[in-house]
């Protein structure tokens, strides 16, 4: 996890300078993405490869992790544009953050930030899933970056989709803060795009539930500000 400054104006004498981020706060007027992985899903869903299935959040976790929602509500810029994916777990997570003190905001559904589509393999148990693979799985992901399930996507496909989405949003919302409640695979794909690394390399990043990853786009050049920051911890 990498620590990062919060968003807002820098006090006099504490400005970021040159190419460095060394002030307590991030400067305004930067095209900045605040990527949040959705909260923990319910127990039955965690027993299978749910991919893009629309599974609900864990109700007990919603209560137990209330301090994390409050920390995110305080951490995020107050004037950000909000985006979720078509799956209810991202909408529910966004709602919980807003209810925890951020305040109600309109959200825009962005399909380009969906999780990896596992096609015919979705819904398989964790024990059954490896039997379907044609390639060795990634050490930190159920399948390699090149593995493409029947009717689904490879992580290489996800990286291309997410990269295109980020470029489009950066062009549509220049110099604005954007909160994107998304998924672990999609956030790894965003890092792959920002760092120009392979899908397999990006899968080495840990992206935990409710973690925050911040990316910036400066005239088409991407910077990673923080990865897998856990709110309130």
Language-model segment annotations:
Residues 100-163, 216, 226:
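Phosphate-handling substructures
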Residues 225-233:
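Short, solvent-exposed aromatic-acidic interface loops
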Residues 42, 89-91, 115-116, 186-188:
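Short, active-site-adjacent cap segments at secondary-structure transitions
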Residues 91, 102-104, 163-223:
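Active-site-adjacent alpha-helix immediately C-terminal to a catalytic or transition-state-stabilizing loop
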Residues 66-73, 159, 163-171:
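Generic structural signal for well-ordered alpha-helical scaffold segments
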Residues 3-21, 25-105:
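Active-site-proximal alpha-helix that buttresses catalytic centers in soluble enzyme cores
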Residues 84-85, 160, 181-182:
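Short beta-strand scaffold positions
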Residues 48-51, 96-99, 122-125, 193-197:
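Short, glycine/charged-enriched secondary-structure capping and boundary segments
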